[in-house]
């Protein structure tokens, strides 16, 4: 959606994705096919965990702004495959920061996560709340991203903005997200698992 909107307003958009198999790759391909209808959209397959590959692309293209939404997502999967999170969310994010530093970009916008709030019980959530107690490796990597971005902003003057997304849903959404799981269960006349004994409430 971000790439599509930027291309529509006239920006040249260069997309990077490793097209991993965390969820159905055909959905990712379909998204790309849709984006390729935009004249100003370019795509190259790349793993951000590979610094040399990412650096080569950045030196060739000379971007002026970076919107970093690539990451290994999913709280539960971080228990099953922790190394994927270190490679993508820690090493990959460091590689993005280094490329931004070398390019002297005007702004880095990156995806953090609401999961950083962890055991914080204060409601409603606030950007100034303590987020020092993540309860998953995924959340810990996102907290680390915020600290890394702050450090690079301080050291090298890179303007950075981190966005703590909550459950993202809508067209082209990930099939492992709650709205998609619920919708599929309803369509197939299956039960929907409710956690916390049904005692949850809106923030």
Regions found by a protein language model. Give the residues of each.
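Glycine/proline-rich active-site loop of Rossmann-fold NAD(P)-dependent oxidoreductases
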Residues: 143, 158-161, 168-181, 188-190, ...
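Short strand-connecting beta-turns/loops that link adjacent beta-strands
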Residues: 8, 187-188
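Conserved catalytic core of Hanks-type protein kinase domains
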Residues: 69, 185-186
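N-terminal Rossmann-like NAD(P)+-binding domain of SDR-like oxidoreductases, especially those catalyzing
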Residues: 1-168
